[in-house]
A protein has these predicted regions:
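Mobile, glycine-rich extracellular loop/lid and propeptide segments
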Residues: 17, 45, 59-64, 92
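Structural recognition of alpha->loop->beta junctions
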Residues: 30-61
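Acidic/His-rich catalytic or pseudo-catalytic neighborhoods
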Residues: 1-33, 41, 69-174
Length: 174
């Protein structure tokens, strides 16, 4: 598909995939230390013209320069963890005249605004990460969309005739 996208005029190729890797390194370590998982064989089959892969599924946070694993595939591989606890800032600099990608960088930022409690207990602020003051304008914007989506989000889409458990199967999924 990449040749068709390039032929149609695409200058930058970004792949979104709901599959991820396991990462034993820091959330911003581009070396890809300890990266493993079922996404790797998929990545190794991607066209070398891919510039960025935004991944997920494993709920882990990472920014990986995939050229450290496979020099023939010099794209960035990113994931922002889970539940909005991390946001990935991605910067793709493209020459406006030629359309050539000049540089690509990504950085994961831990998002925390205030301590809270949930069913699992207290969730305190972590002093080693910056805390962001909640913005009323963004809360209002999110509230508008939450309200607009409420009917669809609460719509019954099926029923379950038996018990649903959170017991983990052989693959670790529940």
């Amino acid at each position: 598909m990449v040749p068709q996208l390039k032929a149609a005029g695409a200058d930058v190729i970004v792949v979104l995939v709901h599959e991820g890797v396991n990462n034993s390194g820091d959330i911003n370590n581009p070396k890809c230390d300890g990266v493993s998982g079922t996404l790797l064989p998929i990545l190794d089959r991607l066209d070398p013209a891919v510039d960025l892969v935004v991944s997920g599924h494993t709920h882990q946070s990472y920014v990986c320069d995939y050229a450290n694993i496979n020099p023939a595939r010099p794209f960035l591989l990113t994931s922002a963890g889970l539940r909005g606890q991390v946001v990935t800032g991605i910067d793709l600099k493209v020459d406006a005249r030629t359309g050539k990608l000049l540089s690509k960088t990504a950085r994961n930022v831990v998002v925390q605004s205030e301590a809270f409690s949930n069913a699992r207990g207290d969730v305190p602020l972590v002093e080693s990460f910056p805390a962001f003051t909640p913005r009323a304008d963004l809360a209002a914007l999110a509230g508008r969309y939450r309200e607009a989506a409420k009917a669809e989000a609460n719509r019954v889409v099926g029923t379950l005739a038996g018990p649903a458990t959170r017991d983990r199967g052989k693959t670790g999924e529940s």
